[in-house]
């Protein structure tokens, strides 16, 4: 049965087809080369947004730092990071007033978690900047290296202790006059290969002890390594993301725990929930605004976009928020939570690998490491790069750039959401003291704003007031990229709302298909994807049945496991036919062994082996599920979780 794709759209309303215009099929773009240029862009942009702030020099590291907080009030619509501390604190106070006890309760929850969390929490996560080797490593390795070096420097760290004790070590390490580390270096030498008699380069990795003085150690502890964000669709330019080292991670974790606890209690927060729960939250806010506006009011919704959210955020604002939120709490707790923002106020951005140069005439390639950018002759660079380097030079120390303002991507998602929600919270009539009022949703830098007013002038006034209020705390709503519609049609975090949520099906398109690496995983992923889309994305029964047939077809072609009684010849068909003929109960064979497909849209939740178990020949059962079978690995069962299975 072959499918004509145009038939799928005959009865689809236009708004449901919007999702197919998303750039989601095909491979996403990946970045190549170094991220140095993108990182310099980020550093330069961040300083430009805060350029009217005050410059100071960090006494410990000698890094020049720009502080835009309580800077000039904006006179134009350009994005800026001049948050006013008193406005932030007032927004926090109003948030607490309208949610009684919220900060108090979240602090108590967090305090409990702080005392129980083990240090191995930090092994979760991907690539982490390993300050001992000055490059990225998997999180577990970076943590182990850090603990090992702390130990050899007389600190008490251990891998199974509490996270809070590890953080005490981090604090102590920053007071030390010097830290001795073991670092790796590469030796290259040219040797003649005995076999081929050609010259080859041999690399050996050696270990050496190195002493870091206080300044060098502090710079490393405060460094965020940067990389280019991969696989971003729908963008022409790549951008830089940051990964912090182990010294910062633990402190950030506790701050985010507190902020998460607060977000869970805020109806306007799109974090930390996701999926259908997030849609339900959203629908509630929309319902509330629509119900109130039915008789006399107009209701409009802005699908919002903020300009460079994290480059205009400021760690000092977060410090003020935390100081306020924890104001009645024990001293030790306040200290632990305030360290993360303080470290971010003094952070350094590592510029990455540097630039690659090649000479066409001499066929030579050479890399200029970031450390050399401070004093290399700029005549080798093209004009745009030259401008970047000139701008960033005053900020450079040892190949890292001092970056006090701004937050870098994805660091304080929860806490910045709390800040956003605190402005949405000010839209209640008792605060606006006029005819317009607003509400909305915030999820990290994404927001949807619903404004109600008796007439269009009121709506405009409400939007203007929201815009200006945001400016006061360093949030810059982009007038160019936000658009306004009658409430009932908007987009928030890639959920499209039109009198209810429209399934954004194209987001799922890449997961339909067979990867061709692992037969059993592909089978279970394939049917699960179809099941999930029936639950979440309006995939109807007829289309799902068709998707299932196409999937089985695709699967059989990928693994060449056509039914044993088929006429199709492949290089597996001889073996599969033999198995087919030897098997008494042919229905019991797995699809990957040339068996028939027993899946339909009613039994997608059952793994294939379970589905066919009763139908299998005994010796076939023994082969599939035999602990002594050398081709099937079996772990000792450590614990049993009873799955909650919905009928």
Curated annotation (Swiss-Prot):
The keyword Transferase appears for this protein: yes
Cysteine disulfide links: none
PROSITE patterns per the UniProt record, alphabetical: RDRP_SSRNA_NEG_SEG (PS50525)
Sequence motif Nuclear localization signal, location on chain: 187-195, 203-216
Enzyme class: transferase
The record's account of how the chain is modified after translation: Phosphorylated by host PRKCA.
Reaction(s) catalysed (UniProt annotation): RNA(n) + a ribonucleoside 5'-triphosphate = RNA(n+1) + diphosphate
Chief location: host cell
Promoter-binding site as annotated region, ranges: 249-256
Compartments reported by the entry: Host nucleus; Host cytoplasm
Short name of any one Pfam family annotated for the protein: Flu_PB1
GO molecular function, a single term: RNA binding
EC number: 2.7.7.48
Residue ranges annotated for the RdRp catalytic domain, each copy included: 286-483
Biological process per Gene Ontology, one example term: viral RNA genome replication
A GO CC annotation given for this chain: host cell nucleus
Cross-referenced InterPro entries: RNA-dir_pol_NSvirus (IPR007099), RNA_pol_PB1_influenza (IPR001407)
Polar residues bias spans: 55-64
Keywords: Eukaryotic host gene expression shutoff by virus, Eukaryotic host transcription shutoff by virus, Host cytoplasm, Host gene expression shutoff by virus, Host nucleus, Host-virus interaction, Inhibition of host RNA polymerase II by virus, Nucleotide-binding, Nucleotidyltransferase, Phosphoprotein, RNA-directed RNA polymerase, Transferase, Viral RNA replication, Viral transcription
Function: RNA-dependent RNA polymerase which is responsible for replication and transcription of virus RNA segments. The transcription of viral mRNAs occurs by a unique mechanism called cap-snatching. 5' methylated caps of cellular mRNAs are cleaved after 10-13 nucleotides by PA. In turn, these short capped RNAs are used as primers by PB1 for transcription of viral mRNAs. During virus replication, PB1 initiates RNA synthesis and copy vRNA into complementary RNA (cRNA) which in turn serves as a template for the production of more vRNAs.
SUBUNIT field: Influenza RNA polymerase is composed of three subunits: PB1, PB2 and PA. Interacts (via N-terminus) with PA (via C-terminus). Interacts (via C-terminus) with PB2 (via N-terminus); this interaction is essential for transcription initiation.
Similarity field: Belongs to the influenza viruses polymerase PB1 family.
Protein name: RNA-directed RNA polymerase catalytic subunit
Gene: PB1
């Amino acid at each position: 049965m072959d499918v004509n794709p145009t038939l799928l759209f005959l009865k689809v309303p236009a708004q449901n087809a919007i999702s197919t215009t998303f750039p989601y099929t095909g491979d996403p773009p990946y970045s190549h080369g170094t991220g140095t240029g993108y990182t310099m862009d980020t550093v330069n942009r961040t300083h430009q947004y805060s350029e009217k702030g005050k410059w100071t020099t960090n006494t410990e590291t000698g890094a020049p730092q720009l502080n835009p907080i309580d800077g000039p009030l904006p006179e134009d619509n350009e994005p800026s990071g001049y948050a006013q501390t008193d406005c932030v604190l007032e927004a926090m106070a109003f948030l607490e007033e309208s949610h009684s006890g919220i900060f108090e309760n979240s602090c108590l929850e967090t305090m409990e978690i702080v005392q129980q969390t083990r240090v191995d929490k930090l092994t979760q996560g991907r690539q982490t900047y390993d300050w001992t080797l000055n490059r990225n490593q998997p999180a577990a390795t970076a943590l182990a290296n850090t603990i090992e070096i702390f130990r050899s420097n007389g600190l008490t760290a251990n891998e199974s202790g509490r996270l809070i004790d590890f953080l005490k070590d981090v604090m102590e390490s920053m007071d030390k006059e010097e830290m001795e580390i073991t670092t790796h270096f590469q030796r290259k030498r040219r040797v003649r290969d005995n076999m081929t008699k050609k010259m080859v380069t041999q690399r050996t990795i050696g270990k050496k002890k190195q002493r870091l003085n206080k300044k060098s150690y502090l710079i490393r502890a405060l460094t965020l390594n940067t990389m280019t964000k991969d696989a971003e669709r729908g963008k022409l330019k790549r951008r830089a993301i940051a990964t912090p080292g182990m010294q910062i991670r633990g402190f950030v974790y506790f701050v985010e725990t507190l902020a998460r606890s607060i977000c869970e209690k805020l109806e306007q927060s799109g974090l930390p929930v996701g999926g259908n729960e997030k849609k339900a939250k959203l629908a509630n806010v929309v319902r509330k605004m629509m119900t109130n506006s039915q008789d006399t009011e107009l209701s409009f919704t802005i699908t919002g976009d903020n300009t460079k959210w994290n480059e205009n955020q400021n760690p000092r604002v977060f410090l003020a928020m935390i100081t306020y939120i924890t104001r009645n709490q024990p001293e030790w707790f306040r200290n632990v939570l305030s360290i993360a923002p303080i470290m971010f106020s003094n952070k350094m951005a590592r510029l990455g690998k540097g630039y690659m140069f090649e000479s066409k005439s001499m066929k030579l390639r050479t890399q200029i490491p970031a450390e050399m950018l401070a004093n290399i002759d700029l005549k080798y660079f093209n004009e745009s790069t030259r401008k970047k380097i000139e701008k960033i030079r005053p900020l450079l120390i040892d190949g890292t750039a001092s970056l006090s303002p701004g937050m870098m991507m994805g660091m304080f998602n929860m806490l910045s959401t709390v800040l956003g929600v605190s402005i949405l919270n000010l839209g209640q009539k008792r605060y606006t003291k006029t005819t317009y009022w607003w509400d909305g949703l915030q999820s990290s830098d994404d927001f949807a704003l619903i404004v109600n007013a008796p007439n269009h002038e009121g709506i405009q006034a409400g939007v203007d007031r929201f815009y200006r209020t945001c400016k006061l705390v360093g949030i810059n709503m982009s007038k160019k990229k936000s658009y306004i519609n009658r409430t009932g049609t908007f987009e928030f975090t890639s959920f499209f709302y039109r009198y209810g949520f429209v399934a954004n099906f194209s987001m799922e398109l890449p997961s339909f298909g067979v990867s061709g690496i692992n037969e059993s995983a592909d089978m279970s992923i394939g049917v699960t994807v179809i099941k999930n889309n029936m639950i979440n994305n309006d995939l109807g029964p007829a289309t799902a049945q068709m998707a299932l047939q196409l999937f089985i077809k695709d699967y059989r072609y990928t693994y060449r496991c056509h039914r044993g009684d088929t006429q199709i010849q492949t290089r597996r068909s001889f073996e599969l036919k033999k198995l087919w003929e030897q098997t008494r109960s042919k229905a019991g064979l797995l699809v990957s062994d040339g068996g028939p497909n027993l899946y339909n849209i009613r039994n997608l939740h059952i793994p294939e082996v379970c589905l066919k178990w009763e139908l299998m020949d005994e010796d076939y059962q023994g082969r599939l599920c035999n602990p002594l079978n050398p081709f099937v690995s079996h772990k000792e069962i450590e614990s049993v979780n009873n799955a909650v299975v919905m009928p």
